[in-house]
């Protein structure tokens, strides 16, 4: 065991996922399970079936599907039908989770992200230590509030129901420390898995890459506008590929129209789908993260492990991952233009990460065994 080799019995952890499919927060959960399996026995609650089921089966992690509503939506008080569905479903989910905790007797109960809440209630009822893992700002990055819009009440409940809250960046921990001063909040930088592959073709497809879901908060428009400005000012035009899934057809249409309207088709390429990061990233030189409120920015770590430098907006938790060896920060459009056009140079030293993953794993191990 990492820090507890003298312990003969591993602690049992029951972990509530916020959704049934693999997403950023669920991927973080899986990565923690992978690195902590020698220290803890895990089981997981899924709110519905999805791709997480296969990932857990592969790891031989027991899981339970308990259907439930989160508390990240807002409804009018007169929507009696909706409120009744939430009440009945939540009561059933809390009851099922209560029985599961009584039967499986976990030593610690986790809630992953701000979205679910029912497991925190069941943990409180059974007097089990509860840890809330926060991976997002909420309103700033995904546009939602918790507690069905009554956030002050939600913050009070999170403090009362939790022995520990973990933020995945100092920016996250800082925000929620101000909102929840009566509970212990710690920052843990997550381990990021990476399977290094041999690159067959050394020729790069483009200089810059934006990788991940196409949503407005990721800042694609700002980058395309900066390339447009490079063209208008007669500066060197960079090549940019935007790769990732898209569920917002209107936003995708706006991006394509922006490219075509400014005749940037030879410089900006947008491709929709799910891509293998280990295969795709090495085909580029620099990853761009232009999000206005990125909580952690795991894609930055992935890019660095792939050998890419990064160009990152100085906002949210992302700047915490940048140092003089691995990338460049930009504060405004002029600085973005300078980096895209080559006027601002990137580091030419060996890339190093801003934190030691092994030390972070040891830290979380010690925190959990102290509960």
Indicate where each model-derived feature is located.
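A conserved mid-protein helix/loop that constitutes part of the nucleotide-sugar donor-binding site
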Residues: 26-31, 206, 215-231, 253
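Short hydrophobic beta-strand element within catalytic cores of glycosyltransferases
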Residues: 300, 309-312
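Nucleotide-sugar donor phosphate/pyrophosphate-binding loop at the beta->alpha transition
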Residues: 92-93, 129, 138-161
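Glycosyltransferase donor-sugar binding loop
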Residues: 45-51, 192, 211, 239-253
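Conserved acidic donor-binding segment of nucleotide-sugar-dependent glycosyltransferases
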Residues: 323-334, 341-344
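Nucleotide-activated donor-binding/catalytic signature segment of Leloir-type glycosyltransferases, i.e.
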Residues: 244, 252-274
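Carbohydrate-associated surface elements
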Residues: 171, 191
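Aromatic "clamp/platform" in nucleotide-sugar-dependent glycosyltransferases that forms part
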Residues: 292
């Amino acid at each position: 065991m990492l820090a507890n080799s003298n312990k003969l019995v591993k602690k049992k952890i029951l972990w509530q996922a916020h959704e049934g499919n693999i997403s950023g927060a669920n991927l973080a959960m899986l990565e923690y399970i992978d690195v902590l399996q020698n220290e803890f026995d895990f089981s997981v609650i899924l709110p519905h079936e999805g791709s997480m089921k296969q990932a857990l089966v592969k790891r031989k992690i027991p899981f339970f599907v308990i259907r439930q509503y989160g508390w990240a939506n807002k409804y009018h008080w007169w929507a009696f039908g909706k409120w009744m569905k939430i009440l009945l479903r939540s009561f059933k989910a809390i009851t099922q989770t209560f029985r599961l905790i009584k039967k499986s007797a976990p030593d610690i109960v986790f809630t992953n992200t701000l979205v679910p809440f029912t497991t925190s209630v069941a943990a409180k009822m059974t007097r089990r230590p509860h840890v809330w893992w926060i991976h997002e700002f909420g309103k700033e990055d995904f546009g939602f509030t918790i507690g069905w819009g009554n956030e002050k009440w939600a913050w009070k409940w999170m403090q009362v129901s939790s022995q520990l809250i973990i933020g995945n960046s100092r920016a996250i921990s800082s925000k929620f420390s101000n909102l929840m001063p009566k509970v212990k909040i710690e920052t843990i930088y997550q381990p990021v898995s990476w399977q290094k592959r041999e690159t067959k073709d050394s020729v790069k497809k483009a200089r810059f890459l934006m990788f991940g879901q196409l949503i407005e908060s990721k800042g694609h428009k700002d980058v395309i506008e900066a390339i447009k400005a490079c063209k208008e000012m007669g500066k060197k035009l960079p090549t940019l590929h935007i790769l990732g899934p898209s569920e917002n057809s209107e936003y995708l249409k706006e991006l394509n129209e922006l490219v075509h309207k400014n005749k940037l088709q030879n410089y900006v390429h947008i491709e929709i789908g799910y891509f293998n990061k280990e295969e795709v990233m090495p085909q580029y030189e620099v990853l761009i993260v232009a999000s206005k409120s990125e909580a952690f920015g795991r894609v930055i770590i992935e890019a660095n492990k792939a050998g890419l430098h990064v160009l990152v907006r100085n906002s949210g938790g992302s700047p915490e991952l940048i140092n003089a060896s691995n990338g460049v920060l930009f504060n405004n459009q002029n600085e973005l233009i300078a980096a895209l056009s080559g006027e601002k140079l990137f580091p030419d030293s060996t890339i190093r990460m801003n934190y030691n993953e092994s030390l972070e794993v040891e830290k979380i191990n010690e925190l959990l065994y102290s509960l």
